């Protein structure tokens, strides 16, 4: 199990790279994260949801994403509450305190999923969440040491030297852990080093001396990480590309921002995620309103930031606007939530750029989907993950044929479009045509680029980590009889 000294130390990337490295060694590998918190969900073939990081790790391992790879997914809806997804299915919304009390039942689900994976594969790479040093969260924990103890697995602790203080991170974690948890950690590694590795030899040795743990490597910064699907939206914002400018307002409950990954990978495209407090730039080729875990709440947030004024001005200047899922709903005339599916019951006015109306009702739709463009008959693959149904005159100008039905809406001037289909930009031919309509060319093979980068990441870890030492730490897991 790979645990970190904090959030965003690179655990997900390490698991993806190690999964590809071990697969290249001929091992059957599966990724596993008992509990994840993310609104960036992936859809599995059976209509379940898991964290998108685990979907990338599954790809690295040569597997289709499966709900057992992330049995508990928390999708924040407010600062103190989240939708709880258990083994792919929505179990309801829980306040933080209620979730803490319900963890005992969730541990059973995580162990059940883990044991299924362990029975099917040579090795399971487990990713922790946050840090085991959060001692106030240890009771009832299912994300780090609580799971490691219940499953009987050894732990590799990873620190991040990029943010500074990595010696204190690792030694401090050693200090605050209970002796039984400390004993589970068998080794440490340092991630995201920049510069001459030999300069940290003394620091590495000091950590080993103070903790008694051996080092499995000091891993240099992997410069091509931006070519892989991002787990954090700011990883996308940090990469600047070409002249085609795609501007994205950073919604408070932004969801499924993986829609931006293929655009960010385009040499001709710069994706700019605009944080709160800043106006949307006036020189955008496209304003893309992304998905949201709280559409009505994020529409109010968008207005509070003044972005509604910026979007309408962009459209008046002749600019293009695309709304996906929640963003599509925001572009319409109104959103009606009679049952309080998205929050408090009520009806709100939309941005009015599409002549459509949304009603938040019915079952949640979670499915992988295959479509074709109505203009040009180009193949488009993606997924749907939404509540609500959208209808209205602009739906008569749908732009996708999705499994026998028309999907999406287009404004009368052709410059505003919306759809419930996430992931459509991973389809190279569609993305190239979309960018061509904006006046920019593309010949990028997105999937080939992701595969090549995973191979490069695996080689990077083989060079700088003691992968043999990691394999020696692995222990057989007794799988309970069903």
Curated annotation (Swiss-Prot):
Which residues are responsible for catalysis?
325, 422
Magnesium as a keyword of this entry, yes or no, is: no
Q: In which pathway does it act?
A: Cofactor biosynthesis; adenosylcobalamin biosynthesis
Keywords associated with the record: Cobalamin biosynthesis, Glutamine amidotransferase
What InterPro entries does the record point to? Class_I_gatase-like (IPR029062), CobQ/CobB/MinD/ParA_Nub-bd_dom (IPR002586), CobQ_GATase1 (IPR033949), CobQ_N (IPR047045), CobQ_synth (IPR004459), GATase_3 (IPR011698), P-loop_NTPase (IPR027417)
Matching CDD domains, A to Z? CobQ_N (cd05389), GATase1_CobQ (cd01750)
User: Does the keyword Transmembrane belong to this entry?
Assistant: no
Q: By its UniProt entry, which Pfam families does this protein fall under?
A: CbiA, GATase_3
Task: Fetch the PANTHER family from UniProt.
Answer: COBYRIC ACID SYNTHASE (PTHR21343:SF1), DETHIOBIOTIN SYNTHETASE (PTHR21343)
Against NCBIfam families, the record matches this protein to: cobQ (TIGR00313), PRK00784.1 (NF001989)
Role according to the record: Catalyzes amidations at positions B, D, E, and G on adenosylcobyrinic A,C-diamide. NH(2) groups are provided by glutamine, and one molecule of ATP is hydrogenolyzed for each amidation.
Q: Which family does it belong to?
A: Belongs to the CobB/CobQ family. CobQ subfamily.
Write the protein's name: Cobyric acid synthase
């Amino acid at each position: 199990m790979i645990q970190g000294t904090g959030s965003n130390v690179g655990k997900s990337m390490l698991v993806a790279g190690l999964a590809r490295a071990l697969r290249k060694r001929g091992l059957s590998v599966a990724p596993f994260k008992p509990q994840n918190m993310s609104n960036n969900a992936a859809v599995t073939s059976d209509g379940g949801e898991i964290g998108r990081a685990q979907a990338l790790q599954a790809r690295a391992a040569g597997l289709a994403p499966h709900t057992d790879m992330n049995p508990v997914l928390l999708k924040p809806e407010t600062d103190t509450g989240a939708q709880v997804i258990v083994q792919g299915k929505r179990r309801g919304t829980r306040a933080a305190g209620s979730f803490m009390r319900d963890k005992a039942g969730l541990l059973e689900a995580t162990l059940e999923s883990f044991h299924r994976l362990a029975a099917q594969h040579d090795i399971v790479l487990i990713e922790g969440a946050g840090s085991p040093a959060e001692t106030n969260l240890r009771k009832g924990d299912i994300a780090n040491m609580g799971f490691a103890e219940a499953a009987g697995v050894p732990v590799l602790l990873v620190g991040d030297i990029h943010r500074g203080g990595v010696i204190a991170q690792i030694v401090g974690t050693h200090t605050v852990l209970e002796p039984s948890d400390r004993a589970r950690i068998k080794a440490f590694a340092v991630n995201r080093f920049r510069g001459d590795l030999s300069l940290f030899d003394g620091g590495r040795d000091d950590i080993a001396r103070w903790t008694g743990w051996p080092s499995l490597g000091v891993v240099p910064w992997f410069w091509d990480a931006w070519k892989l699907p991002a787990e954090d939206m700011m990883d996308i914002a940090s990469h600047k590309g070409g002249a085609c400018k795609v501007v994205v307002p950073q919604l408070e409950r932004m969801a499924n921002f993986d829609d931006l990954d293929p655009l960010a990978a385009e040499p001709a495209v710069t994706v700019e995620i605009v944080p709160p407090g800043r106006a949307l730039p006036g020189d955008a080729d496209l304003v893309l309103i992304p998905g949201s875990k709280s559409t009505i709440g994020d529409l109010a947030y968008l207005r509070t930031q003044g972005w509604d004024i910026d979007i309408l001005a962009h459209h008046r200047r002749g600019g293009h606007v695309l709304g996906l899922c929640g963003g599509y709903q925001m572009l319409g005339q109104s959103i009606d939530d009679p049952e309080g599916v998205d929050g408090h019951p009520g009806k709100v006015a939309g941005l009015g750029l599409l002549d459509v109306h949304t009603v938040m009702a019915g079952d949640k739709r979670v499915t992988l989907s295959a479509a074709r463009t109505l203009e040009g008959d180009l193949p488009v693959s993606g997924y749907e993950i939404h509540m609500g149904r959208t209808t209205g005159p602009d739906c008569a100008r749908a732009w996708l044929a999705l499994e026998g039905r028309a999907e999406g809406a287009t404004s009368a001037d052709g410059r505003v479009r919306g759809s419930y289909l996430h992931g459509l930009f991973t389809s190279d031919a569609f993305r190239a045509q979309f960018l061509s309509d904006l006046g920019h060319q593309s010949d990028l093979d997105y999937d080939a680029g992701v595969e090549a980068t995973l191979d490069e990441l695996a080689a990077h870890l083989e060079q700088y980590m003691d992968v043999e030492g990691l394999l020696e730490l692995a222990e057989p897991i007794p799988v309970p009889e069903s």
